[in-house]
């Protein structure tokens, strides 16, 4: 299959993956309206073309939390990444390091902290959920610090799981799920050889290390469901802010008032995110939520954004809407599933090229030059009017 654009990797991943894995990463919550709006709303945003600018010294470099990045992109935390390619978290982390950007390890990764951190020559980021088991949370934080992690991404938009109806149809959950997954693996031999046989152990490394026993897919679903904590509040996070001495980012902000609370709480950054449309269907797309949040807290806190970003043009759009940087989730997992570490490197190369074209043709020599002036104002007024 020819890969000429960053968006080509989705089809390549679908060919290679068993359906239960493809639809797990590809799907969203309920009717998937927010999932679709995330990409559609970004695509609808018109960039403002400018000409005859001297763009010979264009640079994508930026800094986030004191860390130099080759471009304003971070690989987002994605659970079960190690099921999409052999030791997938390690491969993705190496690709990110090669391109000079951070990789964020999920709490529910296949590869544990202690396997991923030594594989790269720059500190990775670590993501943690709010869970009832505070002992696990503290243990994970201690292990992350011991592994040299400096930046913590704290996900707060999962006090309860969203209903992901696709999973029941695909075999991730539902009747006879284990048998359906086994049949799918047999009919996808490339994945079965690379990951199914040679990518073991297939458990959640970070969770298994704490529990002292392997954590299978069924164990993962049960353990995570039992540990969601709907009682969590800002006050409950105080001990984490005191414990964690490095940058702390709150992920899952969609409302300006919550963004202001994050500033008052003492967070160093936020991620404007609807969890890729995987939690509450019907909420605003990130592209529609971001401008009001940026108006409320820009300059007081570092703003990242995710959900719906598939190309370098989308990165430029998000920055023009008010983000300081973006996180890529599905996009890198598609590339990882299709072609491993090399696929993620190529994806990031494509995104970099797309950003350079967009910046050149909008007259932005640096990331700081990408502002609301980079957008056609009729588009901006439509966003502001929601």
From Swiss-Prot:
UniProt name for this protein: L-lactate dehydrogenase
Places the protein is found: Cell inner membrane
Keywords: Cell inner membrane, Cell membrane, Flavoprotein, FMN, Membrane, Oxidoreductase
Positions of the FMN hydroxy acid dehydrogenase domain: 1-380
One Pfam short name: FMN_dh
Name of the encoding gene: lldD
One GO term of the biological process aspect: lactate metabolic process
EC number: 1.1.-.-
Catalytic machinery residues: 275
Binding site for FMN: 106, 127, 155, 251, 306-330
General function of this protein: Catalyzes the conversion of L-lactate to pyruvate. Is coupled to the respiratory chain.
Catalysis: reaction(s): (S)-lactate + A = pyruvate + AH2
Gene Ontology cellular-component annotations: plasma membrane
GO molecular function list: FMN binding; L-lactate dehydrogenase activity
InterPro entries in UniProt: Aldolase_TIM (IPR013785), Alpha-hydoxy_acid_DH_FMN (IPR012133), FMN-dep_DH (IPR000262), FMN_HAD (IPR037396), FMN_hydac_DH_AS (IPR008259), LldD (IPR020920)
Residues noted as binding substrate in the record, renumbered to the chain: 24, 129, 164, 278
Cofactors named for this entry: FMN
Predominant place of localization: membrane
Organism listed in the record: Pectobacterium atrosepticum (strain SCRI 1043 / ATCC BAA-672) (Erwinia carotovora subsp. atroseptica)
Family designation: Belongs to the FMN-dependent alpha-hydroxy acid dehydrogenase family.
HAMAP family reported in the protein's UniProt record: L_lact_dehydr (MF_01559)
UniProt topology in membrane: Peripheral membrane protein
């Amino acid at each position: 299959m020819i890969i000429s654009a960053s968006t080509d990797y989705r089809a390549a991943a679908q060919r290679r993956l068993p359906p239960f894995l493809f639809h797990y990463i590809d799907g969203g919550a309920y009717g998937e309206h927010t999932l679709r709006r995330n990409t559609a709303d970004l695509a609808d945003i018109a960039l403002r073309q400018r000409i005859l600018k001297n763009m010979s010294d264009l640079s994508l470099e930026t800094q986030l939390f004191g860390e130099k990045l080759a471009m304003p992109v971070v690989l987002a935390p994605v659970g079960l990444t190690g099921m999409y390619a052999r030791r997938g978290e390690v491969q993705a982390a190496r690709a990110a390091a090669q391109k000079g950007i951070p990789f964020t390890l999920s709490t529910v990764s296949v590869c544990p902290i202690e396997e991923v951190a030594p594989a790269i020559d720059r500190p990775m980021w670590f993501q943690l959920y709010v869970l009832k088991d505070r002992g696990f949370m503290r243990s994970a934080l201690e292990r992350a610090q011991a592994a040299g992690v400096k930046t913590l991404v704290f996900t707060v938009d999962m006090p309860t799981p969203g209903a992901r109806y696709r999973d029941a149809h695909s075999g991730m959950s539902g009747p006879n799920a284990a048998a359906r997954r086994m049949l799918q693996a047999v009919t996808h031999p490339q994945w079965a050889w690379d990951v199914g046989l040679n990518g073991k152990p297939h458990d959640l490394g970070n969770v298994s290390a704490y529990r002292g026993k392997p954590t299978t897919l069924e164990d993962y679903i049960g353990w995570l469901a039992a540990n969601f904590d709907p009682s969590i509040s800002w006050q409950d996070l105080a001990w984490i802010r005191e414990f964690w001495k490095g940058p702390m980012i709150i992920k899952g902000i969609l409302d300006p008032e919550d963004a202001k609370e994050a500033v008052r709480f003492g967070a160093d950054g936020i991620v404007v995110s609807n969890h890729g449309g995987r939690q509450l269907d019907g909420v605003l797309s990130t592209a529609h939520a971001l401008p009001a949040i940026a108006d409320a807290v820009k300059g007081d806190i570092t703003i990242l954004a995710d959900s719906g970003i598939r190309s370098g043009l989308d990165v430029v759009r998000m920055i023009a809407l008010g983000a300081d940087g973006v996180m890529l989730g599905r996009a890198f997992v598609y590339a990882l599933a299709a072609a491993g570490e090399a696929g993620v490197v190529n994806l990031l190369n494509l995104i970099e090229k797309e950003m350079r074209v967009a910046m050149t043709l909008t007259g932005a020599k640096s990331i700081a030059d990408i502002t609301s002036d980079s957008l056609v104002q009729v588009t901006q007024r439509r966003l502001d009017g929601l």
